[in-house]
Amino acid sequence: MKWTALVIVAVLQTQFPVTAAQSFGLLDPKLCYLLDGILFIYGVIVTALFLRAKFSRSADAPAYQHGQNPVYNELNVGRREEYAVLDRRGGFDPEMGGKPQRKKNPHEVVYNELRKDKMAEAYSEIGMKSDNQRRRGKGHDGVYQGLSTATKDTYDALHMQALPPR
């Protein structure tokens, strides 16, 4: 059905060609030059308007002075600072609501500094587990990688059933 429709459309296109761009004169070089000129003039005008708007904003800024528009009067607080200065008094933490920070024990600190002398001993040699330390499974330990002993025992107790053929 699809092939017959495709063949019919192909035969009709060969007998009655769709009007080409040449019949309308759209490939005439004079028309292309005219359209290029219009596009160039449009680009120059848009660029001039953009530059005028960009550099003339300083003259438009004093249009909303104090007292003219009540919407903008609410925003004028009379000070030049845009942001408040945090932590003017030393020792106060803004994350704790401005309350003074209490001195923490070194054991209560979340992040401890790295001590290279102690770390060098721990990571100088990484040992391998001996055979008696490894847990021996039923021969397919690769399936159970990363499971705890309790979870591994649960999986060992389950019997795998073969999937039915499709």
From Swiss-Prot:
GO terms assigned for molecular function: identical protein binding; protein homodimerization activity; transmembrane signaling receptor activity
UniProt modified residues of type Phosphoserine: S58
Chain positions covered by the region annotation Disordered: 126-156
Range of residues in the leader sequence: 1-21
Subcellular location: Cell membrane
Pfam families for the chain: ITAM, TCR_zetazeta
Post-translational modification note: Phosphorylated on Tyr residues after T-cell receptor triggering by LCK in association with CD4/CD8.
GO biological process, one term: adaptive immune response
Topological domain ranges for the Extracellular compartment: 22-30
InterPro entries listed in its UniProt record: CD3_zeta/IgE_Fc_rcpt_gamma, Phos_immunorcpt_sig_ITAM, T-cell_CD3_zeta
Major localization listed first in the record, in broad terms: membrane
SMART domains noted in UniProt: ITAM
Transmembrane segments annotated in the record for this chain: 31-51
Highest taxon in the source lineage: Eukaryota
Any one annotated GO CC term: alpha-beta T cell receptor complex
Stretches of the chain found on the membrane's Cytoplasmic side: 52-166
Membrane topology term: Single-pass type I membrane protein
Keywords tagged on the record: Adaptive immunity, Cell membrane, Disulfide bond, Immunity, Membrane, Phosphoprotein, Receptor, Repeat, Signal, Transmembrane, Transmembrane helix
Chain ranges of the ITAM domain: 61-89, 100-128, 133-161
Family: Belongs to the CD3Z/FCER1G family.
Function, as annotated: Part of the TCR-CD3 complex present on T-lymphocyte cell surface that plays an essential role in adaptive immune response. When antigen presenting cells (APCs) activate T-cell receptor (TCR), TCR-mediated signals are transmitted across the cell membrane by the CD3 chains CD3D, CD3E, CD3G and CD3Z. All CD3 chains contain immunoreceptor tyrosine-based activation motifs (ITAMs) in their cytoplasmic domain. Upon TCR engagement, these motifs become phosphorylated by Src family protein tyrosine kinases LCK and FYN, resulting in the activation of downstream signaling pathways.
Domain notes: The ITAM domains mediate interaction with SHB.
Protein name: T-cell surface glycoprotein CD3 zeta chain
Taxonomy of the source species: Eukaryota, Metazoa, Chordata, Craniata, Vertebrata
